[in-house]
Amino acid sequence: RLVFISSITMLLVSPIGHISWDIDSHFKFAISSSSVAYVGLSEPELEVLTNGADFIQNTDTYVQNTEKINTLNKNSDAIIKYIDHNISLTALPSGVMIALLRLFGANFFVIYKLGQIPIVLIYSLCCYFAMRRLHSGKMILAVVAMFPTSLFIASNYSYDTWVIGFVMIGMAYFVGNCQEKGVVSTKDTIIMVIAFAIAIIPKQIYLAFLVIPFLMKQDKIENKKKYYSICSMAFVIMLFDL
């Protein structure tokens, strides 16, 4: 709950502009996932994708930020360019939100800001289920989840939130089973493997995370053939980045 409230607060109070890493690219992923055909762009949306002056200019006061929002909203009705759709699994939640907001005629500012809410929700849910699985170390995970950088990324267009959140779930199931007596259940194995596989879909550079399930203690594995077969499926799952 605290993660969600903190992230939403950051989202709402942050000035509009290029305030995070590669906003132009990540917003393009989101808006490209908002349609199954060509995606129409309004002038302010194109400003985001091209880092136009009206979008990236700095504002120092509330009044300046309000004026900037009004300037961007002024030309948000007309479509001036079309781009190809490109549905991505990690950007799809934001894409669906953007599509719904467009359906109801929301202006650019509302679309841009509320399109980030699914990112906050996914991150918050990942943190919740990860902490729920651990027997001890919940506070350590909570501290990591509440790092200002993590919250800031979660309140902006980014697929890094997806990586952080699902890695937390995967690690929680791995560590949680190490803390328990008995063998690893098939259910926990599947959840752990899927979490790691989903986490690295946006960035295959994190491929090393798929090795973690293979490091489970031997005495925790009841059926080694079955366990390692499930772990190997992660390499197949990660290929399904739509």
Model region roles, listed by residue range:
Residues R1-L2, I140, V163, K187-A195, ...:
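Alpha-helical transmembrane segments of integral membrane proteins
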Residues R1-T66, M233-L242:
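Transmembrane signal-anchor helices characteristic of membrane glycosylation enzymes that use polyprenol
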Residues F129, I164-K181, I190-F196:
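Specific aromatic-rich, kink-prone transmembrane helix
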Residues N156-V163:
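Short acidic/glycine- and proline-prone juxtamembrane loop motifs at membrane-interface regions
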Residues Y173-V183, L207-M238:
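Perimembrane helix-loop-helix junctions
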